[in-house]
From Swiss-Prot, chain A:
WD repeats lie at residues 226-266, 306-347, 348-387, 390-434, 506-543. This is Probable catabolite repression protein creC. Gene3D superfamilies: YVTN repeat-like/Quinoprotein amine dehydrogenase. The keyword Transcription regulation applies. The gene is creC. Belongs to the WD repeat creC family.
Swiss-Prot record, chain B:
Residues 54-467 form the USP domain. Residues 253-269, 692-708 have a biased composition (Polar residues). Residues 1-31, 118-145, 236-269, 494-754 are annotated as: Disordered. Residues 580-629 form a coiled coil. Residues 653-665, 733-754 have a biased composition (Basic residues). Residues 236-245, 576-647, 717-732 have a biased composition (Basic and acidic residues). It is an enzyme of class 3 (hydrolase). Ubiquitin thioesterase component of the regulatory network controlling carbon source utilization through ubiquitination and deubiquitination involving creA, creB, creC, creD and acrB. Deubiquitinates the creA catabolic repressor and the quinate permease qutD. Also plays a role in response to carbon starvation and the control of extracellular proteases activity. Keywords: Coiled coil, Hydrolase, Protease, Thiol protease, Ubl conjugation pathway. The gene is creB. GO terms for biological process: carbon catabolite repression of transcription; protein deubiquitination; ubiquitin-dependent protein catabolic process. This is Probable ubiquitin carboxyl-terminal hydrolase creB.
């Protein structure tokens, strides 16, 4: 597929509906918007970014491309049609620890804001804050259902109103001195038109709790007092008003409480000898401070060490009980984070894993990594389902499209360093395994066994895997806690291969974030391009009619990607 | 021995307390380099050379050679093979030699420079962490130039001498490579600078294109070196049964041991380069008319992959194997339907090499500019790799590779610039080898050369070696552990216990002064492997130096007389290649000549144009230099082109072409588009059995080679023949346009320009 570097303004996809309907539904996403954030110049105190010596061995601080946190503070329910049928039954995190019982808020419903005003801050961490001169007017006039977007770029952090006419002008822009914000998240539970809780993690390890409407902030893990390595990913714990989880580049997962003060962290483990530390470092999870610890006056609430490797990303399951963590060492670790234990360890085909997400019903986990693959794992069956081949470089973000998922078929998307956006459809019945002598088979006819069979087999599988992991371990006293099942890497010949339904170059620079909205797909890139692609106006059940009604189609029908798209082209 | 004692000073703080160290010349101690700092906790020196970190002197644009040599040295199986083939020089004789060739610096002479350095250090210390933009022109202490200068002034210098006679071989590129490796392995200093002068002499003597002081292509050099090693080794093997062979039976015992313990398919001791670097590509061509699939195997020593902007090595490899349509001017001659037909072709890997050398084709010939351009595409490479493009029947198609070395090209174009190597060492992490300078670097540093960073530095050749998931996981556990925790200690103690690596001879000479802990030296004369290293290669350990009789040339080997150059080399060459080649050439000549000449004419015209275009380049200096070399090379080409088809007796030119065609065969010239018939028209039987194979079996049988392995042996002979027949197709090519064309063009213009 030779494709020019120029990005098209439409995305076409072809979708296999199901077996009954042999045809392919098609659709076109139109580029609605391309917002380009300016990269701020380096802070005067910073060393010049460009070192004249390309071989300079001084380590460069981590940075990341633009990532977005989107929030709508309106009342309208924008949830997709298809979500998990089962109610969230998991108890909230830290339920059993009275030391962490929620303190009844004295101010009633009023949210607590952080202490310090960021605009007047004299902190050496914050360089300056630029607010829009009419920001309060803009806030009052706007449609409450409109989207706010928070975006990091280099050392800047911007607050954008995507529903505004002049959305390129941020409502506020924070410039930090040296640290780059690498990740941020909005607390969905506490958001309102007068309050938004944002947690953001920086390359210095410091975490900022920021409330944009009042422009207040607080600094957590100040100067890395709890964990002094960069924050690679941050998420509010589902159902919690105050607690969020941060992944650090040193392999630690830390739960912080925005209301608590920092304290110098010392591991709370019984056997503290170096030898014991070393032995326990083989475990998939070292609880250096348990959520059940009585000592909860200060941060951290909990601190787990997963590995000596960078944690790339993690994701909470929709049932709020499990956590999928991906690491630079190529492992996907599925945790029961309420019980603080690792259940399963899967490995990438090769190379580090970069991103992870759950299907809306919690049945599947999807990862992307340095093997250029998107991999689907079945959570209940605890096994690999398929490898999705189509990216030409590393995969930076994967996300399900909950508006295009139902009980049988799932739609997800992925973006990567190849500047591409890929869309994938899969339904379990349609996956095929490559047959030994027909690797190029594009027919999607053969089927794999039904779910129940898999489930039975999985038991046997995991039992044998367990034995394998037992034999791997060195004889020491730490066996008792290591209940994690280590799954071997499945050979290529025994794993289903899934082609994308669409593959499209959407920019000139690596794409680092992807989000699905009800009416659009959004991507953001390394150099600050935020693109919005309108969904096809027709529903997913319309097929060809929708196409022909759109004048854009005929001009760029050839723009679609590889794999199944080719055969679809033939059928058109 | 005083010189050896003085080496202790270089070993850093843990050792200088050793009583024997004279306390002289301590004041002008140069600042501890990052490398020395890192090596402070090292235990005793190991015998396998894995803990030696030598820079290499640059004799003016020889960085292409230095970076490749370093990459090869740190391939454990390759180093061991070079050191052990045909036999390992007893350490005593090496030491005797080294006593003369390892030269420690006269610190007093460098006093002044160091004093200056100290002063500057003081000046710099006033502004710690200050950006290097201060206008302090004279000498930037962080600059590589300064570091190299300091290294040259302070580190021990290691010269190599031709030791070929002690290997029982005549001098060749292989023996001088072995000289280099053995010297470093046997050196009593852990760090230093090796001077590959002798190696370069041999290289330049035999290969005209390297004689200029011009910038050379590192990949091309790698390919040439590997081919040359193959040729040298095979040539020696074929002439070994000669009566005047001076080597005692110990050598043959060693070679049987080699074949026995290597445990791989071939008992042929000369095939170790093949076993490491060689893989097999299968090109499957399906005629779209009759749908018949024809297959053809080719061997490769490295893979050259085309690059795309914003892609990964994985993707480049997949593209490499992507289906290609042979149509229009590029049709496929189908045996089945007889005639040129449209066809679909794909290249897949049938046998995976144990070391995968990946050449990223950053220098691309652009039609509109008529010259090579460097591509600054961002191409990411993971630390681990598996190959997607294997055939269905490939053995171990999911083989896991780990990245162990990266050759980086720095510069804006193909005709100038600098090469460095970043290499993962056995247990000291990643190191940057920049000619004389060796510096430890962070693992993340390896990722600075995807091609998108300012500074023009891009990965150019990637070395992946096979590994296992278990080894990877074990290594990952060790990574990023605080070095001051128990891990380092444990490592150290294990090193001291079972890693006491000194062979008897070595131990009694130096142990008293060298080793801080006077523990009883363990008798491990076999090679050590670091515990973290994957079990890469069931490689033959070298014959016990106790059991093997003393080398006949222990002392003589130190400074053997340089043999008269041209004769010696042309003699030992195996006649196999030339003969079969010659015959084949003759047989094919008529058929090929037309196509061949047409192609050549075309190339020449293109080159001519390229040259004309080149003249317009702004860069006057480079242009001038280029012109000179181009002119000479073009002339040489013109001179040689008639030879190409007719003459094959002159040693030098034949050798050269052989390597070239080899390199063509090895993964570059992919397809025999029009000649499937001509190919099948040269059945294997037409070729006489390779003399190489025959002579080898002669050599092996007296040494107790079993008939069974002899059978295997002949199988390989057959394979050789097959490869010989495969050599031809390139001559059949006549101006098709395909994805491989740019490469052959590249090759062409490269040899013209360099």
């Amino acid at each position: 597929m030779a494709q020019g570097p120029s990005c098209a303004s439409e995305l076409h996809y072809y979708r296999a509906l199901d077996h009954a309907n042999a045809g392919f539904a098609t659709g076109t996403y139109h580029l609605k918007d391309d917002l380009h954030l300016a990269t701020p110049p380096p802070h005067p105190s910073e060393a010049p970014v460009v070192n004249p010596n390309p071989l300079a061995t001084v380590p460069t601080p981590p940075t990341s491309g633009v990532k977005l946190s989107l929030v709508s503070v309106g009342q309208r329910n924008k949830l997709p049609v298809f979500t998990s049928k089962e109610k969230v039954t998991a108890p909230p995190f830290a339920d059993g620890n009275p030391a962490l019982a929620a303190i009844p808020t004295k101010d009633g419903l009023k949210r607590r804001k952080p202490k310090n005003n960021i605009i007047k801050s004299s902190s050496s961490f914050v360089s300056r804050v630029i607010t829009h001169e009419a920001s309060s007017k803009r806030l009052n006039d706007r449609n409450p259902d409109g989207l706010f977007a928070f975006a990091n770029i280099n050392r800047a952090f911007q607050w954008l109103d995507l529903s505004s006419k002049n959305k390129e002008e941020p409502l506020a822009k924070i410039l930090f001195t040296k640290a780059h914000m690498l990740t941020h998240d909005i607390n969905e539970l506490t958001k309102s038109s007068s309050h938004i809780d944002i947690a953001m993690g920086s390359s210095a390890g410091d975490i900022i709790w920021y409330e944009p409407i009042s422009q207040k902030y607080a600094r957590i893990n100040k100067n890395g007092v709890v964990s002094n390595s960069p924050v690679t990913h941050i998420k509010w714990i589902p159902g919690s008003e105050n607690m969020f989880m941060a992944a650090h580049a040193n392999g630690q997962l830390v739960v912080y409480d925005k209301e608590k003060e920092d304290a110098l962290f010392t591991p709370e483990i019984s056997n503290h000898s170096a030898e014991a530390m070393k032995a326990s470092s083989r475990l998939p999870l070292q609880v250096l401070k348990s959520v059940n610890s009585r000592n909860q006056k200060t941060n951290p609430v909990a601190l787990w060490k997963l590995a000596n490797q960078k944690i790339s990303q993690f994701a909470f399951s929709p049932d709020q009980r499990h956590l999928a963590v991906v690491l630079e060492d190529g492992s996907l670790r599925v945790m029961d984070y309420l019980k603080e234990e690792v259940l399963d360890i899967f490995r990438s085909y090769y190379g580090g894993l970069i991103c992870v997400c759950w299907s809306p019903d919690g049945k599947y986990i999807v990862t992307g990594g340095q093997d250029d693959l998107v991999t689907i794992w079945s959570f209940p069956e605890r096994k690999i389902v398929a490898r999705c081949q189509g990216h030409n470089s590393w995969v930076s973000t994967v996300a399900f499209d909950p508006w295009r998922c139902d009980e049988r078929t799932y739609r997800f998307g992925s973006v990567g360093d190849d500047c591409r956006l890929l869309l994938w459809d899969f339904s379990v019945g349609m996956l095929h395994r490559p047959r030994a002598h027909q690797a190029s088979a594009r027919q999607r006819t053969s089927m794999i066994a039904s779910n129940t069979q898999h489930f039975n087999r999985h038991r046997a599988d995991s039992a044998s895997n367990r034995m394998r992991s037992d034999s791997q371990r060195t004889a020491d006293t730490y066996n008792d806690y290591d209940s994690a099942v280590r799954h071997p890497v499945e050979p290529r010949a025994r794993t289903a291969l899934l082609p994308p339904i669409m593959s499209k170059i959407v920019g000139d620079d690596p794409i680092c974030w992807l989000g699905f909205q009800e009416d659009s797909i959004m991507t953001s890139s390394l150099e600050g391009h935020i693109r919005t692609w309108d969904r096809p106006r027709e529903g997913i059940n319309d097929s060809y009619n929708g196409n022909t009604s759109s004048p854009a189609i005929s001009t760029s029908a050839a723009g679609s990607g590889s794999g199944i798209a080719d055969s679809a082209m033939g059928s058109l | 021995m005083g010189s050896f004692l003085r080496s202790l000073r270089r070993d850093g703080p843990p050792t200088p307390s050793v009583g024997a160290t004279p306390a002289k010349k301590e004041p002008p101690v140069p600042p501890v380099t990052p490398l020395e700092k890192m090596l402070q906790d090292m235990g005793a020196i190991r015998e396998d050379g894995s803990d030696k970190f030598f820079g290499m002197e640059n004799y003016g644009n020889t960085c292409y050679c230095n970076s490749i040599l370093q990459c090869l040295y740190y391939s454990v199986p390759f180093r061991e093979a070079v050191v052990n083939y045909p036999t390992r020089t007893p350490i005593e004789s090496l030491e005797a030699a080294l006593a003369n060739t390892l030269r420690y610096q006269n610190f007093a002479a460098n006093l002044e420079a160091e004093a200056l350095a100290e002063k500057q250090k003081a000046a710099n210390a006033q502004r710690p962490g200050a950006p290097p933009n201060q206008p302090q022109k004279p000498e930037d202490k962080d600059s590589p130039e300064y570091k190299k200068k300091m290294a040259l002034q302070t580190l021990p210098l290691l010269e190599t001498k031709n030791n070929a006679t002690s290997y029982g071989m005549s001098e060749s590129l292989f023996t001088s490579l072995k000289d280099l490796f053995e010297s470093v392995v046997a050196s009593q200093s852990r760090i230093g600078i090796i001077r590959p002068q002798h190696f370069l002499d041999v290289l330049r003597r035999e290969h005209e294109m390297f004689r200029t002081a011009m910038h050379q292509d590192a990949h091309e050099f790698l390919n040439l070196l590997l081919n040359e090693v193959v040729a040298n080794v095979e040539a020696e093997a074929s002439k070994q049964p000669e009566p005047e062979r001076s080597l005692p039976p110990a050598e043959s015992a060693d070679s049987t041991e080699l074949s026995g313990s290597s445990g791989s398919k071939t008992p042929n001791t000369t095939r170790w380069v093949h076993e490491l670097f060689e893989g097999t590509l299968t090109s499957e061509t399906q005629c779209l008319t009759c749908e018949k699939v024809s297959q053809r195997d080719e061997v490769f020593l490295d893979l050259s992959v085309d690059l795309e902007q914003h892609s990964s090595v994985t993707s480049c490899l997949r593209k490499f194997s992507a289906e290609e349509m042979l149509c229009e001017r590029n049709k496929f001659h189908c045996d089945n339907c007889g005639g040129l037909q449209e066809a679909e072709k794909r290249m897949k890997i049938k046998r995976l090499p144990r070391i995968l050398a990946l050449h990223l084709k950053r220098f691309k010939y652009t039609e509109d500019l008529q010259r090579l351009q460097k591509l600054f595409h961002r191409v990411v490479y993971p630390y681990h790799l598996r190959l997607f493009n294997t055939t269905d029947d490939a053995e171990d198609p999911d083989r896991l590779y780990e990245l162990y070395a990266v050759v980086v090209h720095i510069g804006g174009g193909p005709y100038h610039g600098h090469y460095v190597a970043i290499i993962k060492t056995q247990d000291r992490g990643w190191l940057l080898f920049d000619d004389e300078m060796v510096e430890p670097v962070d693992k993340n540093y390896v990722r600075n050369f995807f091609g998108d960073r300012p500074g023009l530095a891009c990965a150019y050749v990637l070395f992946y070696q096979e590994t296992t998931l278990e080894a990877v996981m074990k290594e990952q556990e060790q990574e990023n552990m605080d070095l001051n925790t128990s891990v380092a200690d444990i490592n150290d103690s294990t090193l001291k216990q079972n890693g006491y690596p000194l062979s008897p001879g070595l131990a009694h000479v130096h142990s008293a002064s060298q080793i801080p802990s006077p523990s009883e030296p363990a008798r491990f004369s076999n090679l050590q492997r670091a515990p973290t290293a994957p079990p890469l290669f069931p490689h033959p350990e070298h014959a016990d130096s106790e059991s093997s009789p003393a080398d006949p040339s222990t002392t003589a080997s130190a400074t053997p007389p340089v043999p008269p150059i041209p004769d010696i080399h042309s003699l030992p060459l195996s006649p196999k290649k030339s003969d079969s080649h010659f015959k084949k050439e003759r047989a094919k000549e008529e058929k090929e000549r037309k196509a061949n000449e047409k192609e050549k004419e075309k190339q020449r015209r293109r080159d001519q144009e390229a040259r004309i275009r080149e003249q317009r380049r702004e860069d006057a200096e480079i242009r001038a230099a280029l012109e000179a070399s181009k002119a000479s090379k073009a002339e040489e080409d013109r001179r040689h082109s008639p030879d190409d088809t007719k003459k094959s007796s002159h040693g030098l030119s034949r050798l050269k072409r052989g390597s070239k065609s080899f390199s063509h065969r090895l993964g570059k010239d992919k397809e025999n588009r029009v000649s499937s018939s001509s190919h099948s028209a040269t059945p294997i039987a037409e070729h006489p059995p390779s003399r190489n194979g025959a002579s080898e079996s002669q050599q092996q049988l007296p040494n107790g080679q079993s008939p069974g392995s002899h059978g295997l042996h002949t199988r390989h002979t057959g394979l050789d023949e097959e490869r010989d027949t495969l050599k031809d197709p390139k001559h059949d090519r006549s101006g098709h346009h395909g994805k491989w064309r740019s490469f052959s063009l590249k090759k062409k213009s490269f040899s013209i320009l360099s």
